[in-house]
Amino acid sequence: MCIRDRFFVPESPRWLVKAGKADRARAMLQRIGSAEYAGQTLKEIEHTLQKDNHKVAWSTLLQPQIKPIVIIGMVLAVFQQWCGINVIFNYAQEIFASAGFDINGTLKSIVATGIINLVFTLAALPLVDKIGRRKLMLFGASGLTVIYVLIAGAYGLGIMGWPVLVLVLAAIAIYALTLAPVTWVLLSEIFPNRVRGLAMSLGTLALWIACFLLTYTFPLLNASLGASGSFLLYGVICAMGFIYVLRNVPETKGVTLEALEEQLAAQHTKVCASTQPRSAR
């Protein structure tokens, strides 16, 4: 797939402008919009690249206009891991065994999780642009919340076997359709050009640290809370993730980086103003 994309996926307009190929960038923008849209967007890109044409220090990430975006990116990266789905992949044998499956049934269930993950990841590709990033994130967080509560209830009530398998497969399907691909799309879209490299590095670091903590804390959680309590905890985390996305994450579909930066900066200013004591105003 990577080799195929190397020949068929076009370069981004920003890269073309940066490489001195403004005419090709204009032509590409005209393919997805009008000539007026292409001209306006090209001007915004050129203005941004001229402004950002200097070496960026890590301290830039703490600037008032940039910091809220970096925080959103890191929270999304951590949430993608702490939603708990990788526990199912990493500890599938233990989870299915505790649900009453024998060795043969456990192996078949693990194969089923891989197939479901692949199918729904491919199905997500057209939906990201059709439905929108924010809606998919909200659907994923809310769907996983409900499913984890049901799994916790099943373990708590001693309901084993196929009901647990169906719920686990549903959780994987929702994750593969939403949080798994959309998180990376958002991370690639929300950061301004001048800090994208640094911010993406920080977001990726946060994601893998979260993955490490998730993977190595599940045995401890499972030992102290049991499967029911562990999945209930992941359900609470997903509910918190839903609230965070609802309040803080804008829709990036069809929004330029320049407009998105202004929108998030205005949102940050509004929040700061609302939390400032009246005596200080």
At which residue positions do the language-model features occur?
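Short, well-structured alpha-helical segments
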Residues: 38-47
